[in-house]
UniProtKB/Swiss-Prot annotation:
Family as reported in the entry's similarity comment: Belongs to the DNA glycosylase MPG family.
Stated name of the protein: Putative 3-methyladenine DNA glycosylase
GO molecular function: alkylbase DNA N-glycosylase activity; DNA binding
Record-level GO BP terms: base-excision repair
EC number, as in UniProt: 3.2.2.-
SUPFAM superfamilies, A to Z: FMT C-terminal domain-like
Gene3D superfamilies per record: Methylpurine-DNA glycosylase (MPG) (3.10.300.10)
Keywords from the named record: DNA damage, DNA repair, Hydrolase
Lineage: Bacteria, Pseudomonadati, Pseudomonadota, Alphaproteobacteria, Rickettsiales
PANTHER family: DNA-3-METHYLADENINE GLYCOSYLASE
Database matches in Pfam families: Pur_DNA_glyco
Length: 177
């Protein structure tokens, strides 16, 4: 693998759709496991009806209001965890949902779906509000991998389904084994 370039807070503190697209091909490191990010979705502010912060700031959504570069982990359907990275400027609630990864260590495995990737990696509610910048066990890096991706509508939601804010790698063959 190429030299690690850890993503700085400034990477996350930008437009959420830009962050979501630029996270494609970045490498997620979590407690000794390594995975290439292959699918993301954007959730942006109180005007986005699918965003958890659409109804305002609550104890649950407080992390989404910044600062950027922290994890936002929550439980869905009472059984699956979802991993998000907080984006944008402090005070504006936004995050990128990590929907899919290609695990490259300790094994070669494609995981589509946020619940599957959290289960495999061992991410749970105790990993909510983790600083991704100052962390040796949980961070994101850039190894210079550029992957083709397509843009689609978000899935698994009932509101805001018209937004083209889902980004999916189109050529899994190009991923390193």
């Amino acid at each position: 693998m190429n030299k690690l370039i850890l993503l700085p807070r400034e990477f996350f503190a930008r437009d959420t759709n830009l962050v979501s697209t630029e996270l494609i091909g970045k490498v997620l490191y979590f407690q000794g496991k390594t995975a290439i990010i292959t699918e993301t979705e954007s959730y942006i502010g109180q005007d986005d009806p699918a965003c958890h912060a659409a109804r305002g700031r609550t104890k649950r959504t407080d992390i989404m209001f910044g600062p950027a570069g922290f994890s936002y982990v929550y439980l869905i359907y009472g059984m699956y965890y979802c991993l998000n990275f907080v984006t944008e400027t402090e005070g504006f609630p936004a995050a990128t949902l990590i929907r899919g990864v290609h695990v490259i260590s300790p094994e070669n495995l494609y995981l589509n779906g946020p619940g599957k990737l959290c289960k495999y990696l061992g991410i749970n509610i105790s990993h909510n509000k983790c600083d991704l910048i100052n962390n040796n066990e949980f961070f994101v890096s850039d190894i210079g991998l550029k992957l083709p991706y397509s843009t689609t509508t978000r899935i698994g939601i009932t509101k805001g389904t018209d937004k083209l804010w889902r980004y999916v790698v189109t050529d899994i063959i190009r991923l390193p084994a």
